[in-house]
Curated annotation (Swiss-Prot):
Residues 1-29 are annotated as: Disordered. It comes from Human herpesvirus 7 (strain JI) (HHV-7). InterPro entries: Herpes_UL97 (IPR010615), Kinase-like_dom_sf (IPR011009), Tyr_kinase_AS (IPR008266). Transmembrane segments: none annotated. This is Probable ganciclovir kinase. ATP binds at residues 185-193, 202. The gene is U69. The lineage of its organism: Viruses, Duplodnaviria, Heunggongvirae, Peploviricota, Herviviricetes. GO terms for biological process: viral process. Gene3D superfamilies: Transferase(Phosphotransferase) domain 1. Belongs to the protein kinase superfamily. Tyr protein kinase family. HCMV ganciclovir subfamily. Coiled coil: none annotated.
Length: 546
């Protein structure tokens, strides 16, 4: 144990120091981590996003943008409800096992309303397998081409079940992309992403396939798609339009690039960018307020775009590997898998803040809570508004970096090196730490990320940043953690001294004089200023509206 001292020479609690690795330096790449905080010995960092300096030599390469990260949930649900077997074979049950006309009428009504009401028959409400003659019905799968949500009602209980069809033709065509000479778009701990004739083929694990299938079915149904729809973009959300749960393969469409790699920012296109930002904000609102799903991994790399000459033609939010249903729906959401006739419950949502978001894009309020309690859960209070605003705050961190890139007179590449590299270096430090083994060190890493968020906030909002800093400083002081309080102050003061506003001052003034620019800055400030729980109660529809 080593006794540490604060800059004011105050003694703090002893810390377990990290073991030093000889001959290895930390790779300077921002990353995200999805950890199993309970009952897992297999804790691995996920794919990292390179710093600007790391990709300079690759600018000439045409890269795909389907960059994904692997999902690992914290805990499995109760084993009794994880896999509910549907004992009836789909191949021998084309219709309801009831009397002729009434059964046919009931089936058609089910397909029209996408709802079915069942009697409990003195069974547990979670034992959906008791109703397999109705649920596992070949006629349902024959009517859909992509994952689709159906509501199951048993007495007063309701379940959201996404039917996932299995197409042998797609399986033979896409489930062995290496043999089909598919081009590699990206790779990581989640597996590989390939491009085969503009079809993005993603290989993942069972848990990620489950949550991705569920999100796909819910978004498709809530957006009002037809049962036969094969589209994979709804409300600016990119979802898979086909899933093979046998081989853990999902299909969607490819895009030109992602926001991290996009460098052609131009101030004269600010109206176009604001419109795109509004569409992305609407995607977050739809996902949370309508679908009751937290994205939990909004970042530059997870926003895919088509663009031409500095104009963003289309932008979509992608990658649901870390997505979680709002906790009040735990145990009530699942997927019905045609290929093996099983109902699989969607993994339980624990809402652990240290498991949510890339640390570099994590909302400041989340970092603030982590600095007091590393294992804290996000308290959504069963209110989708809080969950929605949390995702919007992460989206605002993305927009902040985009605006800074647009305003830097030296160009986007210099802006990335000058303003982003330190943030992503701190973020990487947090990614490489296991908060269970090294909770104090993880806190310190998050503290430095939070300080850098304040520095970048002050680049655009230099008058408001003082109040923000003092609010956070006083909060940490009241919590009694003097070492973290002083680390925040030291990092913020030192990093602020190193960063100049000069490269963005002229264009920043131009943006402030532009009508849409004023609205953009105002909306951005409102979201970035959310640093208390009460702030999360604000109307999520009040910002970034076309």
């Amino acid at each position: 144990m080593e006794q540490l001292k604060t800059p004011q020479n105050q003694k703090t609690r002893p810390r377990n120091m990290l073991p030093k690795k000889k001959g290895k330096e930390l790779k300077k790449r921002p990353c995200k981590v999805k950890r199993k905080l309970f009952g897992s010995e297999n804790i691995r960092p996920n794919k990292k996003i390179p710093l600007a300096s790391d990709v300079d030599n690759e600018l000439e390469k045409k890269r795909g943008s389907m960059i994904r990260k692997r999902s690992e949930t914290d805990l499995c649900p109760d084993p009794s409800v994880t896999d509910l077997l549907c004992h009836e074979s789909l191949t021998v049950s084309p219709k309801f096992e009831r009397d002729g006309l009434s059964a046919c009428t009931e089936f058609e009504n089910f397909m029209d309303t996408r709802k079915i009401v069942l009697s409990r028959n003195e069974k547990s409400v979670t034992d959906l397998s008791a109703h397999y003659p109705v649920l596992c019905n070949l006629g349902i799968f024959e009517r859909i081409h992509s994952p689709f949500l159906f509501s199951i009602h048993i007495d007063t209980q309701s379940f959201s079940v996404v039917y996932v069809p299995h197409k042998e033709s797609s399986c033979s065509q896409f489930c062995e992309p290496e043999k089909n000479m598919a081009r590699i778009l990206g790779s990581g701990s989640y597996g590989m992403v390939y491009d085969l004739n503009n079809v993005a083929i993603k290989a993942s694990d069972d848990l990620e396939s489950c949550i991705s299938s569920y999100v796909s079915g819910v978004v498709r149904a809530k957006a009002g798609a037809q049962l036969t729809s094969r589209e994979c973009v709804f409300k600016s959300l990119l979802i898979c339009n086909s899933v093979c749960l046998n081989h853990k393969i999902s299909l969607s469409k490819t895009y030109d690039t992602d926001l991290y790699k996009f460098t052609d920012w131009k101030l004269e296109n600010v109206e176009n960018y604001y419109s795109i930002f509004c569409n992305l904000a609407e995607a977050v609102r739809f996902l949370n307020m309508v679908c009751k799903i937290n994205h939990c991994d909004i970042s530059l790399a997870n926003i895919l775009i088509h663009h031409k000459e500095g104009i963003i033609l289309e932008a979509v939010l992608a990658d649901y590997s870390l997505a979680e249903v709002h906790p009040q729906y735990n145990g009530k959401c699942g997927i019905l898998r045609q290929f093996d006739h099983r109902i699989q419950i969607v993994p339980k949502s624990y809402n652990k803040l240290c498991d949510m978001f890339n640390p570099g894009f994590r909302p400041m309020i989340a970092h603030k809570i982590i600095l007091v309690e590393v294992y804290a859960e996000f308290d959504g209070k069963g209110n989708p508004v809080r969950h929605c605003n949390l995702d919007l705050c992460a989206l605002a961190q993305v927009f902040l970096l985009c605006v800074i890139r647009m305003l830097d007179e030296r160009g986007c590449r210099e802006a990335q090196k000058y303003y982003e590299n330190r943030l992503f270096t701190y973020s990487n430090e947090a990614c490489t730490l296991n908060p269970i083994k090294y909770p104090l060190e993880y806190k310190d890493a998050c503290c430095k990320v939070l300080a850098e968020h304040l520095v970048l906030f002050g680049i655009l909002f230099y008058r408001e940043v003082v109040d923000m800093f003092e609010n956070l400083y006083d909060f940490l002081h009241a919590s009694g953690d003097l070492s973290v309080r002083d680390l925040l102050e030291e990092t913020y003061v030192n990093d602020s001294r190193d960063v100049r506003r000069q490269p963005i001052r002229y264009r920043h003034a131009q943006l402030q004089r532009h009508e849409i620019g004023q609205i953009l800055l105002n909306d951005l400030q409102q979201l970035l200023s959310i640093i208390t729980i009460s702030d999360l109660e604000k109307d999520p529809y009040s910002v970034f509206r076309v």
